[in-house]
Every structure is written in C-alpha cells, then in structure tokens.
C-alpha cells in the first residue's frame, strides 16, 4: 500500500522553509516548542475569521517575532492598531514571560491559490450542508481563476451522509508530488458536520522553481 509523505516537509529548504526559526539548548527546546504551539493555537482560534494562511515564528536573544500571513489584515490589525496590541498582551499572558514581541501582518497577494484557505473554504461549505462535489468544484474553479498550474482536493468521511465512509478526490492540471523542485502548497482541514468529521486535503501546484540549496 502506497504511503504519502507530507509535501511541505519533503521539500524543506528546497522550495519551502521552516515556520519556526530559532536555536535552543537541549534543556530549553521543549519549552520553546510548546510556546510556539500555544501561540499558533491562540492566533488560529481567536482570529479564525481573518483567513490565516500560515504563522512564522522567529526568536533572537530578547525578542519574539511573529509573522502572520492573512487574506484579511484589517481584522488582525484592528482600529488604530488595537488588535495588534491585544495580541501582544494575550501572548505575554500566555507565555508568562517578560519578552519583547513584534507582530508582522502580511497580506496574501493571491488568497484563492492558497491551499490552507482553499481547505478552509471547503470545510465551511460542508458545514453548511453543501454537497461535497459542489464545494470542491467551486474551490477548484476559484483556484483556476487564480492561475494555479494544478490542484488536487480529497474529501474523506461520510460523504453526503452516506452510511459507509469513503474517500473521493478531484484533480485539475498537474500536481507532480515526486518532483522536489515543484512548488507544492499543501494543507489539511476538518469539517464538523451532523454526520461526523470529514477530512479535507488540498494540494496546489504553483510551478517549478530553482532550489535555494543543492539537492544531494
């Protein structure tokens, strides 16, 4: 039976980069890793409506820098920047540590081509009881209008309330998962419906690019 590796981890430092960038000793590593998890969980939970694609965290000696990639930056920034200040205050309370925090809000130039936001859109449609084929077709059409070179969407579970769970997928264009220089965006989401949880996987092919580092 074929096993599939995570496309983002498979291409680390080739077409994708680490989303946490810092150095730690063996003793402090677990604590910093837990802090990253708490920060991401908090932002994704509190700013669910902001259309967040990814969160990058970097640290130096006395500063924590959080970069949030979003399709709706206004929701995060808030009026006169009050939203940013609230995030800083909440993160300090969460970490229970006196540290300088910098929040960068980066607007996505092409949100319809982002795998995370595509998966989120499909999950929202399924939770509104839209038929899964219609939801996936709408998402794929939006991605095609955003000029992606290929997209694949898989939905698993009790589709349309069926008694037996199954998986169905749709692909348009090329999605070369075995090509390391292929710029593949990947995301997984869950839709909580009255029939149970549906799993959603999205692969988006944005063309090939020259690796930043040599591939051995």
UniProtKB/Swiss-Prot annotation:
Keyword Transmembrane helix belongs to the record: no
InterPro entries to which the protein is assigned, alphabetical: KH_dom, KH_dom-like_a/b, KH_dom_type_2, KH_sf_prok-type, Ribosomal_S3_C_sf, Ribosomal_uS3_bac-typ, Ribosomal_uS3_C, Ribosomal_uS3_CS
Domain of life: Eukaryota
Subcellular location: Plastid, Chloroplast
Assembly with partners or alone: Part of the 30S ribosomal subunit.
UniProtKB keywords: Chloroplast, Plastid, Ribonucleoprotein, Ribosomal protein, RNA-binding, rRNA-binding
Major localization class: plastid
GO cellular component: chloroplast; cytosolic small ribosomal subunit
Family per similarity comment: Belongs to the universal ribosomal protein uS3 family.
Protein name: Small ribosomal subunit protein uS3c
Domain KH type-2: 39-109
Keyword match rRNA-binding: yes
Biological source species: Guillardia theta
SMART domains registered for this protein in UniProt: KH
Gene Ontology MF, one: structural constituent of ribosome
Any one biological process term the GO annotation gives: translation
């Amino acid at each position: 039976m074929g096993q599939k590796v995570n496309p983002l981890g498979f291409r680390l430092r080739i077409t994708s980069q680490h989303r946490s960038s810092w150095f730690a000793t063996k003793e402090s590593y677990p604590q910093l890793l837990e802090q990253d998890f708490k920060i991401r969980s908090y932002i994704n939970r509190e700013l669910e409506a902001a259309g967040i694609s990814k969160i990058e965290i970097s640290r130096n000696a006395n500063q924590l820098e959080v970069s949030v990639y979003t399709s709706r930056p206004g929701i995060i920034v808030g009026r006169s920047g009050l939203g940013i200040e609230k995030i800083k205050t909440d993160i300090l309370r969460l970490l229970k540590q006196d540290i300088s925090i910098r929040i960068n809000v980066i607007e996505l130039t092409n949100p319809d081509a982002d795998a995370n936001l595509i998966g989120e859109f499909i999950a929202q449609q399924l939770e509104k009881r839209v038929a899964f084929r219609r939801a996936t077709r709408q998402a794929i059409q939006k991605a095609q209008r955003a000029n992606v070179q290929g997209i694949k969407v898989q939905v698993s579970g009790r589709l349309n309330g069926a008694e037996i769970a199954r998986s169905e997928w749709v692909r348009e264009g090329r999605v070369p998962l075995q090509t390391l220089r292929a710029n593949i965006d990947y995301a997984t989401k869950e839709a909580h419906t009255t029939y149970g949880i549906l799993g959603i996987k999205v692969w988006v092919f944005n063309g090939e690019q020259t690796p930043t580092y040599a591939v051995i």
